[in-house]
């Protein structure tokens, strides 16, 4: 029996060694699983942090984009208002300019009518002056002829100078022009 005890001992030792090997194997597998789980947890935390950072970044970018869009829309709105005001100002200036032009056209037409009437008046005055000048010339010739024919002997000895006669003719013309 000692052989069988020894076989039983061997067998129990073998089983104990196998159990110990299995325990160590399970322990190493448990350690590997624990380290794998720890690594997965750390990686999950990194992923969660990255996802959180990405989420925050996305929300920040969305906020910035929405702010930029709002600012751009406000600037466009202000620009449109300025353009509208500019157009209104331009339209009022054009209206004033058109009004000024129509006023100037009316004044120009009035000036043309006045000029036409003045031209007619001037033409009438010129024709009247021509008639008056012809009459005066005729009267002067008559006077000159009568004065020459009725000269006395004393006057004939002292002939008049040309300048005195010219002065008299100019004086008569001057008086005729002023309607004296």
Swiss-Prot record:
GO terms for cellular component: chromosome; nucleus. It comes from the Eukaryota. Disruption phenotype: Abolishes localization of hop1 to DNA double-strand break (DSB) hotspots. It is found in: Nucleus; Chromosome. One of its GO terms (biological process) is reciprocal meiotic recombination. Keywords: Chromosome, Meiosis, Nucleus. Coiled coil: none annotated. Homomer. Interacts (via C-terminus) with hop1 (via C-terminus); the interaction is direct. Interacts (via C-terminus) with rec10; the interaction is direct. Interacts with mde2; the interaction is direct. Required during the early stages of meiosis for meiotic recombination. This is Meiotic recombination protein rec15. It comes from Schizosaccharomyces pombe (strain 972 / ATCC 24843) (Fission yeast).
């Amino acid at each position: 029996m000692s052989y069988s005890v020894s076989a039983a001992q061997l067998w129990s030792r073998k089983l104990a060694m196998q159990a110990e090997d299995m325990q160590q194997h399970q322990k190493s597998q448990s350690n590997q699983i624990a380290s794998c789980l720890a690594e997965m947890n750390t990686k999950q935390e990194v992923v969660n942090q990255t996802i959180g950072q990405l989420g925050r970044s996305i929300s920040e970018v969305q906020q910035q984009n929405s702010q930029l869009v709002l600012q751009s829309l406000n600037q466009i709105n202000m620009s449109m208002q300025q353009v509208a005001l500019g157009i209104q100002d331009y339209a009022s200036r054009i209206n004033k300019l058109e009004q000024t032009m129509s006023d100037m056209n009316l004044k120009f037409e009035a000036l043309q009518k006045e000029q036409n009437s003045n031209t007619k008046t001037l033409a009438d005055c010129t024709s009247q002056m021509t008639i008056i000048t012809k009459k005066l010339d005729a009267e002067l010739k008559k006077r000159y002829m009568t004065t020459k024919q009725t000269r006395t002997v004393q006057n004939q000895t002292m002939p008049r100078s040309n300048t005195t006669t010219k002065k008299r003719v100019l004086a008569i013309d001057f008086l005729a022009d002023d309607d004296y």
